[in-house]
From Swiss-Prot:
Residues 301-317 have a biased composition (Polar residues). This is E3 ubiquitin-protein ligase SH3RF1. Autoubiquitinated. Ubiquitinated by SH3RF2, leading to proteasome-mediated degradation. One of its GO terms (molecular function) is MAP-kinase scaffold activity. Residues 268-319, 684-731 are annotated as: Disordered. It holds the Pfam family zf-RING_UBOX. Keywords: Cell projection, Cytoplasm, Golgi apparatus, Metal-binding, Repeat, SH3 domain, Transferase, Ubl conjugation, Ubl conjugation pathway, Zinc, Zinc-finger.
Length: 861
C-alpha cells in the first residue's frame, strides 16, 4: 500500500487529523489523539470513549501508546523518499500540506515539531508516480465559452478544479485564468475532495439536566456541527468546538457528505418515513433522472453544500431552465434563498417549489410569513374564466361562451346536468367537468392568529394547494395573492357553471351530497327555469302554484349594474351548526374582490295557526320586484317537533310558485330547496284536493317528528382544541335556542324520514320576529377553527369524541415526524386515545396542536 494512502487511514476518529506517536489507546482498544482526549476531560471532567462510551478510570497521561501505530510510523519515516514526477507545483503543494499538518498535529510539543519537521515533510508527502497532486481534469473537446466568465480551453489541456458549481458545471483554472466550464467537456483525472460531514442547527437544543443528559451536545440555531456517526434512528453523534456528544437528527440539516454518512449508519429497521418524507425521496430520484437527461442545463440545487455557499452567492451561475415536471427540494440555504426570490417565500426553512405544465405550486415552510405569491395557470381543458373568473378587480361577468363549461363538484357527486325546457320538448346539455383547480369560498370571516395564516372574508375566493391532516388548508387568496394556511371548516368548495345566457334571477338550492358551493350563471329572464340533477334525482322541482312573493335581497347585497347573478348551491358533509348558519347566497361579482355577497338563512318556524287557508289568502300580494332584479327566499323551514307542518296546495300551472322541498338524509343537516320564478294566481279544485291529502300526511309526519331532538344530536365540528370547547359550547347553545336540534329520525332502512314543507311567506319578517327567542342568533356564528398541525398529507382527521385525560410531560420529547407532538417538560397534554404500542394521541394545551407522542414521556395528573 502507498504511504500517502496509508497515512490517510491513520487518522483520529474525533478530529480526523492524522495520528502520531503521542496517540493513546483506551482500555476498550480504541485509539485517539492526545489532544482530543484532553479536550474531553476538560469539558466533561471525566473520560469516556467517544466510540463505545466506556468510562476510563485513569488519566490521559497514564494511558499507553499504541505500539502498532508507533512502529508503523517509524517504518514510514525510515523509508527513502521516492523520486516523483509530480512537478515543482505539486512538490510545493505537498510541502505546504505537510507543514500545515505538522503545525496542527495532535499531541506534539514545539521541540518535537522543530526537530522532526524535515523528516515529516519527506515522509508525509512523497509524490505518487503518475497521479497529479491537485484536483484536475483533462479537456476532451475545445470549449470557446458561451457567456462572460466561461473558461476557454482546447482539447488536451489540463484544468485545475477549484470547486463544483453543480453536477453540470465546474469552476476551474488554467494558466492563471479562472472561469466556468461544463462537466461533459472534460474528463476528471483527480476529483475534488469531499466536503467534511457537517450539519447546520435548525433549532436551539438545550440540556436542562446536565447530569442526566451529560452525553448530549447542546447547540444554538445556525451552529455548524461536525457529524461523526449515527447512533440510532433518531440520534447522531457530532462535535461542536472541542465538545463531543449526541444530538437529535430532526434538529439539524445535513450536507451531502453527512447525509451519506447518516445513510450508511442507518439501522436496518428504519424506513424511509411516511407522508412528505416518502415524497421527498421519490422526488429526489426523479430530480436525479431529470438532471441526467438535461446535462447541458446550468440549473441545479442538488450538489450545493455549505462549504461553497459563500462563493455560490457571489458567482450567480444558475438559469431557470427546468424541464417540467421537476421538484426542487433544496437543503442548502443559498439555494433556498434563490428559490424564495422567485416565489416570494421566506428562506427560514426549506421550501419546495413544484413546477409543472399546469402552473407553479409553492409549498412554504410552516414558519414562513404570509407574503405575496405568484400567478397561477390552469388546466388547458378548462378555460381560465370558467375556472376562476377574472383574478384582478374590477370583476366583470364572463363573456358568453360557445361551449358551456362547468368546473365540477366533489368526488361523491355526479356530474351536473343542466336542462333547458322549451315548451313540450326538453333539451339536455351535458357540461364538461374538471376537478382542478380547487377553488374555495370563505363562508366565515377569520382573523389570522399567526404570521403564516391568511385572513378570510365572507365570500372571498381561495385557491387551495394542499389539505392538511389536521383540517387546515394551505392556499392563496385570489384577491391578494397571499399564500398561507387557514381553517378548512371556514371555507367550502366552489364550482362555476357558465351558460350562454345573460343575467337572470337568483335561486337557492341546497343538497346533501358533499360540502360544495356551486356558482351558476342562470338563464335569461325569458328563458325557462332550470333543473339540477344529481345522482339521478331532481333537486329542483316545480310542483305547485300556491305560493307567496319571495323576500327580496337587502339593498346591500344587490348589484347596481345588471351583472350576472349567481346561484349558490351548498351541499355536503357539513355539521348541523354549519347547516343552520352557513347557508348563504352569492349576489354577483364584487367590484373590488371576487366575493360572493351572502345573506344568512334565518330559521323561520311557522306557528300552528299558519294553515293552507291562510297561505291561500296571501296569494293576492303582488311580487315586490320584477324583471331582471334578483330575488331570494331568505327563510328556510326547519320544523320543530311541536309545530304542525304547513303543506302546499296545488293549483294551475299558469305560473310557478315558491316551494321548498326538504329532502333530509342521514349525515346531512341541509335541505334541497328550489324556487320557481313567478307567483301564482287563483286556486282551483286541485288545490282543495291537495289540502286534504296534505292534512293526512301532516299527522303522520308529526308522529315521526316527535322525540327527534332526543334521538339525534348535531354533529360535532372538525377537530378542535380542548381550550376552545367553551367557545364551541356557547355557539351550540345559542344555535339551539334559535332553531333547536331537531333532525328527522332514522327509518328502519337507515335513511332519515323525508318530508315536504311549504315556504309560507305570508309575512316573513313578522314570523321571524314572533318566533325569535332571546337566545337566538340571526348572524352567522363561525365554529372554532381546528388546531394547527404540520401539513403532511391530504385529507382530514376526524375528531375523536372519547373523553380526554390530562397528562403532564415529565421529559421533553423532540418530534421525529410531522405527525408527532413536540413535548416540553411541564406541558399539559389532553390524551384522546392510547394505542397498543405505547403511543398516545392527544392535544397540547400550550399551542392546541394534535398529534402522537410516546406515553412514557408523560404522567397522569
Amino acid at each position: 500500500m502507498d504511504e500517502s494512502a496509508l497515512l490517510d487511514l491513520l487518522e483520529c476518529p474525533v478530529c480526523l487529523e492524522r495520528l502520531d506517536a503521542s496517540a493513546k489507546v483506551l482500555p476498550c482498544q480504541h485509539t485517539f489523539c492526545k489532544r482530543c482526549l484532553l479536550g474531553i476531560v476538560s469539558s466533561r471532567n471525566e473520560l469516556r470513549c467517544p466510540e463505545c462510551r466506556t468510562l476510563v478510570e485513569c488519566g490521559v497521561d497514564e494511558l499507553p501508546s499504541n505500539i502498532l501505530l508507533v512502529r508503523l510510523l517509524d517504518g514510514i519515516k525510515q523509508r527513502p523518499r521516492k523520486a516523483g514526477v509530480g512537478g515543482s507545483a505539486g512538490n510545493s503543494t505537498n510541502v505546504l500540506r505537510a507543514q500545515g499538518s505538522l503545525t496542527t498535529n495532535c499531541g506534539l510539543n514545539d521541540a518535537q515539531n522543530i526537530h522532526g519537521g524535515q523528516q515529516r515533510i519527506q515522509a508525509r508527502s512523497p509524490p505518487v508516480r503518475g497521479v497529479p497532486q491537485l484536483p484536475c481534469a483533462k479537456a476532451l473537446y475545445n470549449y470557446e465559452g458561451k457567456e462572460p466568465g466561461d473558461l476557454k480551453f482546447n482539447k488536451g489541456d489540463i484544468i485545475v478544479l477549484r470547486r463544483q458549481v453543480d453536477e453540470n458545471w465546474y469552476h476551474g483554472e488554467i494558466n492563471g485564468i479562472h472561469g466556468f466550464f461544463p462537466t461533459n467537456f472534460v474528463q476528471i483525472i483527480k476529483p475534488l475532495p469531499q466536503p467534511p460531514p457537517q450539519c447546520k442547527a435548525l433549532y436551539d437544543f438545550e440540556v436542562k439536566d446536565k447530569e442526566a443528559d451529560k452525553d448530549c451536545l447542546p447547540f444554538l440555531k445556525d451552529d455548524i456541527l461536525t457529524v461523526i456517526r449515527r447512533v440510532d434512528e433518531n440520534w447522531a453523534e457530532g462535535m461542536l468546538g472541542d465538545k463531543i456528544g449526541i444530538f437529535p437528527i430532526s434538529y439539524v440539516e445535513f450536507n451531502s457528505a453527512a447525509k451519506q454518512l447518516i445513510e450508511l449508519d442507518k439501522p436496518s429497521g428504519v424506513d424511509t418515513g411516511e407522508g412528505s418524507s416518502g415524497t421527498t425521496h421519490s422526488s429526489n430520484s426523479q430530480k436525479q433522472a431529470d438532471a441526467k437527461k438535461n446535462t447541458k442545463k446550468r440549473h441545479s440545487f442538488t450538489s450545493l453544500t455549505m462549504s461553497n455557499k459563500s462563493s455560490q452567492s457571489v458567482q450567480n451561475r444558475h438559469s431557470m431552465e427546468i424541464s417540467p415536471p421537476v421538484l426542487i427540494s433544496s437543503s442548502n440555504p443559498t439555494a433556498a434563498a434563490r428559490i424564495s426570490e422567485l416565489t416570494g417565500l421566506s428562506c427560514s426553512a426549506p421550501s419546495q417549489v413544484h413546477i409543472s405544465t399546469t402552473g407553479l405550486i409553492v409549498t412554504p415552510p410552516p414558519s414562513s410569513p404570509v407574503v405575496s405569491g405568484p400567478a397561477f395557470t390552469f388546466p388547458p381543458e378548462v378555460t381560465y374564466q370558467a375556472a376562476l373568473g377574472d383574478l384582478n378587480p374590477p370583476l366583470l361577468p364572463p363573456p358568453p361562451l360557445a361551449t358551456p363549461v362547468i368546473t365540477s363538484t366533489s368526488s361523491g357527486a355526479a356530474a351536473a346536468v343542466q336542462r333547458s325546457i322549451s315548451g313540450p320538448a326538453e333539451q339536455v346539455t351535458h357540461l364538461r367537468t374538471s376537478t382542478r383547480p380547487s377553488v374555495f369560498v370563505a363562508i366565515y370571516p377569520y382573523i389570522p392568529r399567526k404570521e403564516d395564516e391568511l385572513e378570510l372574508r365572507k365570500g372571498e375566493m381561495f385557491l387551495v394547494f394542499e389539505r392538511c391532516q389536521d383540517g387546515w388548508f394551505k392556499g392563496t387568496s385570489m384577491h391578494t395573492s397571499k399564500i398561507g394556511v387557514f381553517p378548512g371548516n371556514y371555507v367550502a368548495p366552489v364550482t362555476r357553471a357558465l351558460t350562454t345566457a345573460t343575467p337572470a334571477k337568483v335561486a337557492m338550492a341546497t343538497a346533501s351530497s358533499s360540502n360544495v358551493v356551486n356558482l351558476v350563471t342562470p338563464t335569461p329572464p325569458g328563458a325557462p327555469c332550470q333543473k339540477l340533477q344529481g345522482n339521478g334525482a331532481e333537486f329542483a322541482k316545480t310542483v305547485s302554484t300556491n305560493g307567496v312573493p319571495p323576500a327580496g335581497i337587502p339593498g346591500s347585497h344587490i348589484q347596481s349594474s345588471p351583472q350576472a347573478k349567481v346561484l349558490l348551491h351548498m351541499s355536503g358533509q357539513m355539521t348541523v351548526n354549519q347547516a343552520r348558519n352557513a347557508v348563504r347566497t352569492a349576489a354577483a361579482h364584487s367590484q373590488d374582490r371576487p366575493t360572493a355577497a351572502v345573506t344568512p338563512i334565518q330559521a323561520q318556524i311557522p306557528s300552528a295557526s299558519v294553515l293552507p287557508q291562510q297561505a291561500a289568502t296571501s296569494q293576492q300580494m303582488p311580487p315586490p320586484l320584477s324583471g331582471p332584479a334578483a330575488y331570494i327566499n331568505a327563510a328556510m323551514n326547519i320544523s320543530r317537533p311541536s309545530v304542525p307542518v304547513a303543506s302546499a296546495a296545488s293549483s294551475s300551472v299558469s305560473s310557478a310558485a315558491f316551494e321548498t322541498e326538504c329532502n333530509w338524509k342521514s349525515g346531512s343537516g341541509l335541505a334541497a330547496c328550489s324556487f320557481p320564478e313567478n307567483v301564482s294566481a287563483p286556486l282551483n279544485s286541485a288545490a282543495n284536493k291537495q289540502d286534504k291529502d296534505s292534512k293526512k300526511e301532516k299527522k303522520g309526519l308529526l308522529k315521526l317528528l316527535s322525540g327527534a331532538s332526543t334521538k339525534r344530536k348535531p354533529r360535532s365540528s372538525p377537530p378542535h382544541s380542548p381550550t376552545q370547547e367553551l367557545e364551541q359550547t356557547n355557539s351550540e347553545a345559542a344555535l339551539e335556542g334559535a332553531v333547536g336540534p331537531d333532525i328527522l329520525p332514522v327509518n328502519g332502512n337507515g335513511r332519515v324520514a323525508s318530508c315536504t314543507v311549504d315556504c309560507d311567506l305570508v309575512s316573513a319578517s313578522a314570523l321571524v320576529q314572533d318566533n325569535r327567542k332571546p337566545a337566538s342568533l340571526d348572524t352567522n356564528v363561525p365554529i372554532a377553527p381546528p388546531p394547527r398541525q404540520p401539513c403532511s398529507s391530504l385529507g382530514t382527521v376526524l375528531n375523536d369524541s372519547r373523553p380526554c385525560e390530562r397528562y403532564r410531560v415529565v421529559v421533553s420529547y423532540p418530534p421525529q415526524s410531522e405527525a408527532e407532538l413536540e413535548l416540553k417538560e411541564g406541558d399539559i397534554v389532553f390524551v384522546h386515545k392510547k394505542r397498543e404500542d405505547g403511543w398516545f394521541k392527544g392535544t397540547l394545551q400550550r399551542n392546541g396542536k394534535t398529534g402522537l407522542f410516546p406515553g412514557s414521556f408523560v404522567e397522569n395528573i
